[in-house]
Every structure is written in structure tokens, then in C-alpha cells.
Regions:
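Short linear sequence motif anchored by a di-proline
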Residues: 1-153
């Protein structure tokens, strides 16, 4: 399984929730190939400089594992082999995350897993909610010595 979707003219790690059904890049996967990406935390770097950016770890208050909303697809590589790929769905950030990054992963509630996976004529857009700040713990870890690419997106 590879992280990110590869298209003829584009590569993307994540999928924006806004417009997910309007874009031919993600529409079919959202309608037919929803998945979860288990995690116990995720990391973001607050981009202030080309390097030495503050690193944050984000968990849920219980510190239990949680499920990031995802979609998957099959990509045909140059050798002609089909490879499974996955992309995490992101939303606009809540007020706390907006201080660090302009997007945040969609976290699904356990009570919503069955609906997320259920085949449906109407994909569950309402589950792509912005997780409120009180449902996240954001902890500054360190300034991370990482050189950012000049054309990073």
C-alpha cells in the first residue's frame, strides 16, 4: 500500500473534503472505496522557516487509537503492475489547528464506522466534519531540523 494518489499530471498525499464529489480525481474512490487509516497520533510542522520548524503531535484526549477518514485506489505503475494507494481526507482546520496548518485530517467517530463503510447511493459527506479543538490534544515536541523543498505544496 502506497501513501498518496498518483494521477497523470499530479501526485497528492491527501484529499480535500471540500469538493470531493466534484473532482473526477477523487469522486469514484469516495463513492466506492472508503477506508480508515488507523492512527494513535499525527504530526504537523508549523512552517515558519525553511528549516527548524516547530513539530507538533496531535492525539485525541483519551490517547487511544483513532480512525482517519481515507479513500483508496489502484494505480498502474510503469511496470504495468497495479498497486493499492491510500489518501487521507482533510478538512478546513479548527481554530487550534489553524495556528499550525491550513488543513487537518478528518477523524471518524467509532459510532460512524458502519455508515462510513456501508455502500450507499449517497456518500456520507456529513461525516467529513471539522474536528473541534476540544477533541484534540496538540503538543509542541521540538523544532525539527528539516530542510523543506523549494516547491513544497
Amino acid at each position: 500500500m502506497y501513501w498518496g494518489f498518483t494521477f497523470p499530471q499530479r501526485f497528492t498525499f491527501n484529499t480535500r473534503s471540500d469538493g470531493i464529489l466534484k473532482s473526477g480525481l477523487w469522486k469514484t474512490s469516495f463513492e466506492e472505496r472508503r477506508c480508515i487509516v488507523p492512527a494513535d497520533s499525527f504530526f504537523e510542522w508549523k512552517r515558519l522557516h525553511k528549516k527548524n520548524n516547530p513539530k507538533y503531535e496531535i492525539t485525541i484526549p483519551s490517547r487511544e487509537p483513532f480512525a482517519l477518514a481515507g479513500i483508496w485506489s489502484m494505480w498502474k505503475n510503469k511496470a504495468g503492475d497495479y498497486v493499492p494507494t491510500v489518501s487521507v481526507i482533510t478538512s478546513e482546520p479548527n481554530e487550534a489547528m489553524a495556528e499550525i496548518h491550513n488543513r487537518q485530517p478528518v477523524i471518524l467517530e467509532p459510532r460512524d464506522y458502519a455508515e462510513w463503510f456501508a455502500p450507499s447511493a449517497r456518500p456520507p459527506l456529513h461525516l467529513l466534519r471539522i474536528v473541534p479543538p476540544e477533541e484534540m490534544n496538540i503538543q509542541l515536541l521540538e523544532a525539527h531540523n528539516m530542510q523543506l523543498p523549494l516547491n513544497s505544496a
